[in-house]
């Protein structure tokens, strides 16, 4: 285990540097050795799961290999972790710091001390040189490290290197709004007294889930820098919007006009300025202050006034701000439901398996009366397992004093509770009944969705469940309803089918969704034009029914399919009860043509071991989309009320469509199912997209892990997996883009999914190219299975026994298996026949070529030609292009007419006659008859 040690009371610089080191050393863990700065603590309350943190008490010292220490050179700043520095089995200690004159007492193997403004800068430069990409949160926390330690690039120790590092982090996606929220550049002395007064007199109240603050300060003279003070108040008081009023006396600067106005009773020497800051979506301070002569931006504005009553003006603007605040998202709108629960007597080991199976980070605990009695997190379980209590009940480790929320708790309040109490999940209770749960991830997804909607970006609302607020269409999907787009792009009969299906689902109280490829292709056709995507025909439709776990024995999807068959009796129904799915197939229907509609019950999957068949159970639409392979395929459109036509995009699929990249949903996807590698390649090449970098990393790791080879060598490989692999190979090798797909598969080393030794060598490439040429010339009508021939070329590089094993495992046709198995035998026989003593070795007669090759099928001959030398290819080409077209003028009927008696001799006569024609000895019917009289004379009549 490699550990990255943060000093006690960690600030953003040490955290940012640690996060960067964790990227440089995959698998390493970050240890906060003794607490953190309050702002860091607040940051981690929301973003803890983004980083490989580990509790100090969960570390087993015996497994420590290397220690990386950031922003520190003193052992006493590491707390109890300082004891690890003297472990006898420790391989190395490395220190990265920017404090050149700091006291040091640690004996390290690697020292990197450089005079820059932040330790994070040193690590960023390493990341740049290694060409490592960062996520938004990773880039943001590292940018915070540089901002905090350089005073946002204003401190004297700031260097050009810090500026360049920060610029690179911005390119990596660092979020300025997140940085502004947590950066703390410090206060100038003149404002410190006013800040204390403002903190003491601040009025704060919650409105629609948002904290509003206001304070009125009075000074003798104008004080500069109050905008900075306002921003600091907004951050430290946890307000979402703040109005700061400042009343001051103009004093000696009064003009004669001011004195005249004062004599008339008008207060003219008093000035009033108001500064506003807001982080509340859809509020606009400029609109509020413009009527008073103010200006600025939606989130930051100010106004300077005179001749007014300050308290009155502040009250007016404060009330106007309240009216601007939008109705917030409530817990019921995005909570996950139903909640997966366990009993208090469930063992730690059992609870851990549940977490692993469903991908949760914690579980709620209920008693037999279904009342909430506790909650247990993955960290709690990890700690219990670390100490060997796998068989202990969870009731001894669960948190009993559970913080809960109500269904109508607004999102801002939920966020505040999570930060204040450092909790990652909040059960939703309705009159003591557990109705849902909101996790930290759910909140972050909603916040991200809000930010993207505010910035005008479309399509990455990383929301949490069926009840997440669906994304509304914008310019990328048109201003009209998605249903209208469906109606426009789908054939009328298919649109009517979807309408009927939605009506059937709605009468049963279910939600129905169009999911997957149809939604993806709808966007492609609409945004990029139907001309570019003429191959998109919408003949394969996927529907998902969220039946709320109804009809569990059959599945809501199956029941809906059966009902639809009643409306469409011409459809053929196929039911797969194990997976709670059904399919309706129309073949050359007058209206629907050839259409395949899959109807599934919303379900979740679990792979008990790599390359296994998934175990399936009913779930929600969110879980159903979460089990899919790629974000661009995890899109859905609701077809039923409420809000028909709303897009559900929980995982950023629209963003990836716009970025033209294929991103996998889960890190272990390719280990669970290798066919997803082939699907990823297929989508990349077919759509003209790219592999998202992290997805490519996951693919390469899965292949290098050897999991596929171990699966292939098992005594009984999973049949369903080989079927899926065969299907993907068939699609790829049949498609017009097969060359690009094969190139990418080879680059990823993904042919190892078939066999560990299979590589696309230059020789194989030439063979595939030769084969393609032959197929174009001699099988333009595609009577042969072209994909099988291309696969045959690849498998031909393996030993016959391995070749046969793979072909049999893929359940290829018997003739194909036999042809591949006997390929070398066929090649030897052909070579022997073409070099027989009956003909010169360099140029055998045409008849010899024909008679040698005629008994082999085209599949075998095409493979032999592609694999053979130039002379052999020339001979087989001659066979197909000319010799196969030769036939004598005389037939068996002609022989009978000429007086020959039918019998075994006929076959020999016709064969010899054909050979003579092939060798160019005969050219017309008369010559053939003369040849017969010479070589097969009729007996004289008596």
From Swiss-Prot:
Its cofactor is Mg(2+). Its EC number is 2.7.7.-. It comes from the Bacteria. Residues 452-478 are annotated as: Disordered. CDD domains: CBS_pair_DHH_polyA_Pol_assoc (cd04595), NT_ClassII-CCAase (cd05398). One of its GO terms (molecular function) is ATP binding. Coiled coil: none annotated. ATP binds at residues 517-520, 628-629, 633, 673-682, 686, 724. Residues 335-394, 398-453 form the CBS domain. The keyword tRNA-binding applies. Keywords: ATP-binding, CBS domain, Magnesium, Metal-binding, Nucleotide-binding, Nucleotidyltransferase, Repeat, RNA-binding, Transferase, tRNA processing, tRNA-binding. It catalyses: a tRNA with a 3' CC end + ATP = a tRNA with a 3' CCA end + diphosphate. Mg(2+) binds at residues 540, 542. Disruption phenotype: Essential, it cannot be deleted. GO terms for biological process: tRNA processing. SUPFAM superfamilies: CBS-domain pair, DHH phosphoesterases, Nucleotidyltransferase, Poly A polymerase C-terminal region-like. The keyword Transport does not apply. tRNA nucleotidyltransferase involved in the synthesis of the tRNA CCA terminus. Adds the terminal adenosine residue to tRNA. Acts as a nucleotidyltransferase and not a poly(A) polymerase. Belongs to the tRNA nucleotidyltransferase/poly(A) polymerase family. This is A-adding tRNA nucleotidyltransferase. It comes from Synechocystis sp. (strain ATCC 27184 / PCC 6803 / Kazusa).
């Amino acid at each position: 285990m490699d550990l990255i040690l943060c000093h006690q009371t960690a600030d953003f610089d040490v955290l940012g540097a640690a996060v960067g080191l964790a990227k440089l050393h995959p698998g390493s863990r970050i240890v906060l050795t003794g607490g953190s700065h309050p702002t860091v603590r607040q940051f981690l309350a929301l973003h803890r799961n983004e980083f490989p943190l580990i509790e100090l008490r969960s570390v087993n010292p015996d497994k420590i290999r290397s220690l990386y220490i950031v922003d520190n050179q003193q052992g006493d700043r590491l707390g109890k972790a300082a004891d690890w520095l003297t472990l006898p089995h420790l391989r190395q200690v490395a220190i990265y710091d920017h404090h050149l004159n700091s006291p040091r007492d640690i004996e390290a193997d690697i020292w990197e001390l450089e005079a820059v403004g932040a330790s994070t800068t040193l690590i960023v430069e390493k990341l740049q040189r290694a060409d490592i990409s960062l996520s938004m949160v990773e880039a943001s926390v590292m940018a915070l490290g540089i901002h905090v330690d350089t005073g946002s690039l204003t401190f004297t120790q700031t260097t050009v290197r810090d500026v360049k590092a920060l610029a690179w982090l911005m390119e990596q996606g660092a979020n300025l709004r997140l940085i502004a929220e947590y950066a703390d550049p410090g206060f100038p002395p003149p404002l410190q007294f006013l800040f204390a007064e403002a903190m003491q007199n601040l009025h704060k109240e919650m409105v629609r889930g948002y904290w509003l603050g206001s304070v009125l300060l009075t000074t003798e003279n104008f004080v500069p820098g109050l905008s900075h003070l306002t921003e600091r108040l907004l951050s430290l008081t946890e307000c979402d919007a703040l109005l700061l009023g400042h009343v001051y006396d103009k004093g000696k600067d009064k003009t004669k006009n001011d004195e005249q106005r004062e004599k008339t009773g008008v207060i003219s020497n008093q000035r009033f300025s108001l500064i506003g800051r807001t982080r509340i979506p859809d509020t606009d301070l400029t609109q509020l202050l413009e009527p008073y002569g103010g200006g600025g931006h939606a989130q930051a504005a100010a106004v300077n006034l005179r001749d007014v009553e300050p308290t009155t003006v502040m009250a007016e603007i404060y009330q106007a701000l309240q009216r601007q605040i939008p109705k917030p998202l409530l817990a019921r709108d995005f909570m996950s439901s139903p909640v997966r629960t366990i009993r208090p007597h469930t063992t730690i080991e059992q609870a851990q398996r549940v977490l692993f199976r469903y991908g949760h980070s914690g579980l709620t605990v209920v008693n037999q009366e279904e009342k909430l009695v506790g909650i247990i997190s993955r960290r709690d379980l990890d700690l219990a397992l670390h100490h060997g209590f796998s068989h202990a009940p969870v009731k001894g480790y669960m948190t009993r004093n559970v913080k809960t929320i109500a269904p109508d708790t607004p999102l801002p309040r939920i966020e505040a509770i999570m930060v204040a109490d450092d909790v990652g999940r909040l059960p939703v209770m309705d009159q003591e009944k557990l109705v849902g749960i909101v996790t930290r991830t759910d909140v972050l997804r909603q916040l991200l969705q809000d930010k993207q909607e505010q910035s005008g970006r479309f399509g990455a609302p990383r929301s949490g469940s069926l009840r997440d607020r669906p994304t509304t269409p914008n310019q990328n999907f048109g201003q009209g309803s998605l249903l209208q787009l469906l109606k426009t792009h789908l054939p009328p009969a298919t649109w009517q089918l979807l309408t009927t299906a939605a009506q059937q689902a709605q009468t049963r109280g279910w939600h129905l969704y169009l999911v997957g490829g149809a939604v993806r292709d709808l966007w492609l056709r609409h945004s990029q034009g139907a001309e570019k995507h003429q191959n998109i025909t919408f003949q394969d439709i996927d529907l998902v029914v969220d039946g709320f776990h109804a009809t569990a024995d059959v599945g809501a999807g199956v029941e809906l399919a059966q009902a639809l068959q009643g409306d469409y009796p011409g459809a053929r129904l196929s039911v797969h009860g194990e997976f709670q799915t059904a399919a309706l197939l129309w073949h050359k229907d007058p209206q629907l043509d050839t259409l395949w509609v899959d109807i599934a019950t919303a379900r979740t999957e679990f792979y008990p071991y790599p390359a296994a068949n998934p175990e399936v159970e009913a779930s929600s639409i969110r879980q159903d989309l979460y089990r899919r392979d790629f974000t661009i395929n995890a899109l859905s459109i609701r077809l039923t009320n409420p809000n028909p036509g709303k897009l559900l995009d929980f995982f950023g699929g629209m963003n990836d469509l716009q970025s033209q990249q294929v991103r996998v949903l889960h890190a272990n996807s390719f280990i669970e199912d290798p066919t997803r590698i082939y699907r990823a390649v297929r989508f990349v090449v077919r759509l003209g997209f790219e592999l998202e970098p992290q997805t490519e990393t996951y693919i390469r790791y899965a292949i290098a892990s050897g999991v596929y080879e171990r699966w292939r060598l098992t005594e009984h490989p999973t049949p369903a997996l080989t079927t899926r692999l065969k299907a993907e190979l068939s699609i790829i090798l049949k498609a017009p883009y097969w060359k690009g797909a094969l190139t990418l598969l080879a680059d990823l080393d993904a042919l190892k999914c078939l066999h560990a030794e299979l590589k696309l060598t230059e020789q194989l490439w030439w063979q595939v190219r030769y084969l393609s040429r032959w197929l174009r010339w001699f099988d333009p009508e595609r009577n042969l299975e072209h994909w099988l021939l291309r696969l045959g070329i690849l498998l031909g590089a393996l030993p016959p026994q391995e070749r046969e094993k793979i072909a049999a495992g893929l359940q290829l046709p018997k003739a194909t298996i036999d042809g591949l198995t006997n390929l070398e035998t066929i090649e030897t026989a052909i070579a022997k026949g073409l070099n027989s003593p009956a003909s010169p070795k360099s140029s055998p007669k045409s008849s010899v070529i024909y008679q040698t090759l005629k008994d082999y099928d085209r599949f075998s001959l095409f493979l032999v030609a592609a694999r053979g030398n130039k002379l052999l290819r020339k001979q087989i080409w001659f066979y197909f292009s000319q010799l196969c077209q030769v036939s004598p003028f005389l037939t068996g009927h002609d022989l009978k007419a000429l007086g020959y008696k039918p019998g075994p001799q006929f076959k020999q006569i016709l064969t010899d006659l054909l050979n003579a024609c092939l060798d160019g000895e005969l050219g017309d019917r008369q010559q053939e008859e003369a040849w017969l009289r010479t070589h097969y004379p009729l007996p004289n009549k008596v």
